[in-house]
Curated annotation (Swiss-Prot):
Its main location: cytoplasm. SMART domains: PCRF. It is found in: Cytoplasm. PANTHER family: CLASS I PEPTIDE CHAIN RELEASE FACTOR, PEPTIDE CHAIN RELEASE FACTOR 2. PROSITE patterns: RF_PROK_I. Keywords: Cytoplasm, Methylation, Protein biosynthesis. The gene is prfB. Methylated by PrmC. Methylation increases the termination efficiency of RF2. One of its GO terms (molecular function) is translation release factor activity, codon specific. Peptide chain release factor 2 directs the termination of translation in response to the peptide chain termination codons UGA and UAA. It comes from the Bacteria. This is Peptide chain release factor 2. Belongs to the prokaryotic/mitochondrial release factor family. The modification N5-methylglutamine is found at residue 251.
């Protein structure tokens, strides 16, 4: 890397740091951290453990953002100092090392910039992710199980925890429907980019004639809400049914009616939970999911009204694919919203989804 190129990169990073400091309101964040840390010193801080954990989580999230900014600023300053040393006493080996470190630092800047884009009111929340196969029976149900694995692997790469809240296996293969609770900082902020129809084109392993098949799966993503989020759900509007849980592959099947299904009668929204052995806990989880779905429903309605005002028509049917995964006659995964595409289909199916999310978030926040 030439000296002039290194200088240009460092100047660009300096400007990015200025923009980050302004957009992050770092002074406010630092004041909030001090406020939370003071709250942690109260003698009765741990009396309400759930509230205490929320305070700790908020503090850790703010600290992570501030510390990462400071780390980038420090690395940038180190780069400036090293560049001056090289200009005073040219050293080819040191220059090469600096060029490599600048390239790595640029990647860190890009990753941090993506995290800054997650500034929605619930972006930091855990996520509820649902997969529902379209028409096509076993073929589309198998596609749903492939996407299930993809998102599980993606969550693992982010260090998030994945819980299967509801699972309905396919009769021959795959899944008829599955609901995941994904626990991690910014889980909803990232995964909201995956909401939509996912299309698969491949030679079906279930077709003895070896014909090419097209399958569809709907992915729905909602933020998980804390109990203190006020979303009005009247008891008289609910129908609550219990049934026996049936785990994936027939495992962990309860002999009592611990699984819970809640129907919100006015809207027809239905949620189910069977992950816990306790009916009470399943009901609590189902109510959280119901609130999330009702919130998402309201957001979708607001978006629909905005689209009408703008004269835009949004197709919410199976024709509105957000992404195509083509395994035959060639290999390609393409996002139709951003036109970002890759040829490494196996890598994507193994959880390399972040580049698609990155492209989508950058486009929608421009």
């Amino acid at each position: 890397m030439e000296i002039s190129d290194i200088r240009n990169e460092l100047e660009a990073m300096a400007k990015r740091l200025e923009n980050y400091r302004a957009s992050l309101n770092l002074t406010e964040k630092e004041a909030r951290i001090a406020e939370l840390e003071n709250e942690m010193t109260y003698p009765d801080f741990w009396d309400n453990q759930e509230k205490a954990q929320k305070v700790i989580d908020e503090s850790n999230g703010l600290k992570a953002m501030v510390d990462k900014y400071q780390d980038l600023a420090n690395q940038h300053e180190d780069g400036e100092v090293t560049l001056e040393l090289i200009k005073e006493e040219p050293d080819a080996e040191m220059q090469e090392e600096l060029g490599e470190s600048i390239q790595a630092l640029k990647k860190e800047f890009d990753d941090f910039e993506l995290e800054i884009l997650l500034n929605g009111p619930y972006d930091a929340n855990n996520a509820i992710l649902e997969l529902h196969p379209g028409a096509g029976g076993t073929e589309s149900q198998d596609w749903a199980s492939m996407l299930l694995r993809m998102y599980q692997r993606f969550a693992d790469k982010q260090g998030w925890k994945v819980e299967t809240v509801d699972y309905l296996p396919g009769e021959e293969a795959g899944v008829k429907s599955v609901t995941l609770r994904i626990v991690g900082h910014n889980a909803y902020g990232y995964l909201k980019a995956e909401k939509g129809i996912h299309r698969l084109v491949r030679i079906s392993p279930f077709d003895s004639s070896g014909r090419r098949h097209t399958s569809f799966v709907s992915c729905d993503v909602m933020p998980e809400f804390d109990d203190d989020i006020e979303i009005e759900v009247r008891t008289e509007d609910l129908r609550i049914d219990t049934y026996r849980a049936s785990g994936a592959g027939g495992q962990h099947i309860n002999t009592t009616d611990s699984a819970v299904r809640i129907t919100h009668v006015p809207t027809g929204v239905v949620v189910s939970c069977q992950t816990e052995r306790s009916q009470i806990k399943n009901r609590e989880s189902a109510m959280k999911m119901l609130k999330a779905k009702l919130y998402q429903r309201e957001l979708d309605e607001q978006q629909r009204k905005l689209d009408e005002i703008r004269g835009e028509k949004t197709d919410i049917g199976w024709g509105s694919q957000i992404r195509s995964y083509v395994f035959h006659p060639y290999s390609m995964v393409k996002d139709h919203r951003t036109n970002y595409e890759v040829g490494n289909t196996s890598g994507v199916m193994d959880g390399d989804v972040m580049p698609f999310i990155d492209a989508y978030l950058r486009k929608t926040n421009m």
